Structure formats: C-alpha cells, structure tokens
Amino acid sequence: MRPAFRPVAAAGLIAAGVLATSCTAPRPGVTFYGNRASVAVEPGLWCTLGTNQQISSCLADPTKYAHLTLGSGQPLQISVPGDLGAPWLVAFEYKDAAGKTSSGRSELFRDGRLAYTLQPPGAGTQLTRVEVQAGFVLGLDPSGATVFAATRTWVLVILPRPPVVS
C-alpha cells in the first residue's frame, strides 16, 4: 500500500527550502588574544558593494564588539580568517603615561597575511580600542577630500588591567 500524500509535510519541505536559500553565510570573525585570554568578534560594520564597486548597502551594529583586559604595555595578537579579503589594517587608540589619548594604524596588509601583533607604541602606553578594517573603497570625506573607506570592521574595546600591587 502506497502512503497517502501529505500536504503538511510537503509545505514544511517547501518552507525549509525557502529558509535555506534565504539564509546568508556567516560573516567572518576576527580573534584577538592578549593577557592569556582570547575573544572572537563578529563584524560591527558589513557593507556590500554593487557592480560598480560602490557601496550598495551596509549593516552597522554598534553592539558587535568584544572586550579584553590588557595591562599597560601589553601587546595584542590579532588573527583574521583567510576569507577576510586583503587588504586589511589595524587602527588603534591608546593613552600614554600622561593620560593623553592618541591613535595610530598598522601598515596595510595585502600579501595574504592572517596575523599581526600590535605592540603598544611606547613605554607606559595603554591600548584602549582596536579596530580591524577591510574591504576598502574609494570615497570622499565631508570636506570633499578623497579617502579610502573601510566597508568591514571588527572592534575590540580594551579594559585596562589594574596594576599589580606587591
């Protein structure tokens, strides 16, 4: 005896197929490691480009960032996945021993490099924020100057580790 056709089961399979085709692949994450701890973070900004290599849409989520505790002068290791897409760079903010906030950035990595160690720039400096940037496009800033804008970012907020008291 042949089983009867079940419309409910067929509808369920169709719905599952629609869901499977409408799902997007997970976006690549970046891993930060320092002070014997690691944390992975999803992109906080992810823009797609149109056929003319101009930004067609962006998903920005300011809650997509990670925290890591580092002490003054401690380095930070950064690992990016192979599908991140070269080129990429690391932008960072730090406070010097006097408490003055400054910023800097790494070189632009275009050679398939997947890891970078960020050394704090000077004795007594405390890293406070690190951002991996990728997917650069040519654009204009508010003053009309030509800039390369990142279309993908991953953010780490660094919590200062209290000094060890002996």
Regions found by a protein language model. Name each.
Residues 1-10:
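Bacterial N-terminal signal peptides that target proteins for export
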Residues 11-16:
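Hydrophobic membrane-insertion alpha-helices, especially the h-region
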Residues 31-38:
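Juxtamembrane extracytosolic/periplasmic "stalk" immediately C-terminal to the first targeting helix
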Residues 77-79, 89-166:
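Extracytosolic low-complexity repeat regions of secreted or lipid-anchored proteins
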Residues 18-22:
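C-terminal motif of bacterial Sec signal peptides marking the signal peptidase cleavage site
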Residues 24-26:
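Bacterial signal peptide processing site
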Residues 39-71:
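N-terminal edge beta-strand
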Residues 71-84:
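Beta-strand cores of secreted/periplasmic/IMS beta-sandwich domains, seen most often
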